[in-house]
Curated annotation (Swiss-Prot):
Annotated transmembrane regions: 31-51, 72-92
Binding-site positions, Cu cation A2: 210, 212, 214, 218
GO biological process, one term: mitochondrial electron transport, cytochrome c to oxygen
Protein name: Cytochrome c oxidase subunit 2
Keyword Cell wall biogenesis/degradation: no
UniProt organism field: Candida albicans (strain SC5314 / ATCC MYA-2876)
Family affiliation: Belongs to the cytochrome c oxidase subunit 2 family.
Binding positions (Cu cation A1): 175, 210, 214, 221
Any Gene Ontology CC annotation: respiratory chain complex IV
Annotated gene: COX2
Record-linked PANTHER family: CYTOCHROME C OXIDASE SUBUNIT 2, CYTOCHROME C OXIDASE, SUBUNIT II
Keyword Isomerase annotated: no
Amino acid sequence: MIRLDVPTPWGIRLQDSATPNAEGIHELYDHIMFYLCLILGLVSYILYVIIKDYKDNRFAYKYVRHGQVIEIIWTIFPAVILLLIAFPSFILLYLCDEVLTPAMTIKVIGLQWYWKYEYSDFVDSIGETIEFESYVIPDDMLEPGALRLLDTDTSIVVPVDTHIRFVVTANDVIHSFTIPSLGMKIDATPGRLNQVSALIQRTGVYYGQCSELCGVNHGMMPIKLECVSIEDFIEWLGENEVSLNSSMVEQCTVNALILVQF
């Protein structure tokens, strides 16, 4: 199965979901689209009938001043449809804002025009947290198969099937941290911490971009996230000289991550 996890030229469909939040957004989209098609068909039919009757007889509606029944119908019918759309929207909005007990936290900082990531739960051998900056790869440095304006020199690495909290802020202007396949879009506002959670259910590479106009190089702020197995994530921690004997790392990897396999 080929997954659609990146934007495609002339693409009109949503990217494949990799989290429960993204799946809920897709279901809500289909739910609302049903009512939109229903309204489009009904309104188009009414307009067709009115135009056809008027063309055949311009005095067809000469003495029509009001219609109590139709007025009640076009008041109640839209109200019912709005309620049918609103309730699922409110439920999904609440679920997307809910942050469950996270196994790990990643701090995301937006700057003009790059991202900075901090793994505050993990410390290296000298007692410092893992942190790095992520820049877009210029066109003249792209390798074969790389994605223009989407690939970065470094990427976020997270384990699969793990509750992850992203704490998002900015240092200069407003940015927006967005990864469509994860159903994630949250503003990065200077002086404010916003948070969102994600439970990525399959491994892969996911791309996003800054979705808030933030200056001349707004289009040069891609996001690249790699979701790997728990074993590969622990190996990545070792490559960054994280001490696996520290209590915080044991809690976030051994206890919270390995138990997911069972």
